[in-house]
Design a protein with these regions (language model features):
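Conserved phosphate- and dinucleotide-binding cores of soluble alpha/beta proteins
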Residues: 6-160
């Protein structure tokens, strides 16, 4: 999206400078209530900070991202402080996760690191309840999750 803004001559800013008027982003999944799973790229913390800091947020998706239930196509990414990995996995199991996997890097050995130097766990849950985002954040060692439930966003449908 940044490159498109540059091509169109739209000014960009950072949170260091001021509060952005708008944020444009994508999503991995969008349910009928505009709840999202984001974070396949591993930037959940930054994405949530931008949404909370911006005057208005637009999520641009195509129809392949629409799901009747979150978690239908993708697991929930969870950013985890590396030294808390075992503890976080145990706590997430208690929340009913059916599968938890450490995201591994492609093209090199070892895990994916977020831009903050943390690991990403991909978790599968059959039932994503409205307070799951808060329950995940309450686990010591969880930095952020890819669940975006109840955010003030506008979803725009891209067409060809």
């Amino acid at each position: 999206i940044s490159m498109t803004c540059i091509q169109l001559g739209l000014p960009q800013t950072t949170l260091w400078n001021k509060r952005p008027d708008w944020t444009f982003d994508g999503a991995d999944e969008v349910d009928p209530h505009n709840n999202l799973i984001k974070g396949r790229g591993g930037a959940m913390f930054k994405e949530k900070l931008l949404i909370k800091s911006s005057g208005k947020t637009y999520i641009i998706v195509d129809e392949s991202k629409l799901v009747s239930k979150l978690g239908s196509k993708y697991p929930i990414p969870v950013e985890v402080f590396p030294h808390a990995l075992s503890h976080v996995e145990n706590e997430i199991r208690l929340l009913g996760a059916s599968k938890i996997s450490l995201r591994l890097a492609e093209g090199k050995d070892g895990p994916v690191f977020t831009e903050n130097g943390n690991f990403i766990l991909d978790i599968h849950l059959s039932n994503i309840v409205p307070d799951l985002e808060q329950k995940l954040k309450a686990i010591t060692g969880v930095i952020e999750s890819g669940l975006f439930i109840g955010y003030d966003i506008t979803v725009l449908m891209a067409t060809r």
